[in-house]
């Protein structure tokens, strides 16, 4: 079983998590890294437009995301996700659910938490939040990191920022002797 590096991309909606995750995944695969991309369950539901009450079922949504991540851990060298488990805590006001999301997100010892600094214009297509709400989630994520002693790094949500992260991941794997 491999000791998978879990790369968690954090930011509010529209900051570039999905774009960055796809870009980073593609760059790693093209470099010969055994990597997998775990996409956002909640986004799948938004595109289905079936009025599934995401806000009222955050624990379910987070559980589905957790399953997506868990099923590939130990099978590849790197997993990149645009929907870290702990980010589920941003979408509920119920403390036990918030705590469960954060606890589940912190359990991965071999992880890299990356905050994407918003650089592009906000596109509301496929989102449930306004630009102001998305920026407020950015602030809540930074507070979550601080309040829960979660280590993280920040990169710009740009091609250069994503390239920097690809190099960090490749260097990490080289140090571990995996690539």
Q: Where are the model-predicted features located?
A:
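Phosphate-binding P-loop
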Residues: 1-6
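Hydrophobic anchor at the beta1->P-loop junction of P-loop NTPases
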Residues: 9
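Conserved lysine of the Walker
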Residues: 17
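Active-site flanking residues adjacent to catalytic metal/cofactor-binding acidic residues
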Residues: 39, 81-83, 116
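Conserved nucleotide-sensing/catalytic segment adjacent to the nucleotide-binding pocket
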Residues: 50-96
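A glycine- and Lys/Arg-enriched "phosphate-lid" helix/loop adjacent to the NTP-binding pocket
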Residues: 95-173
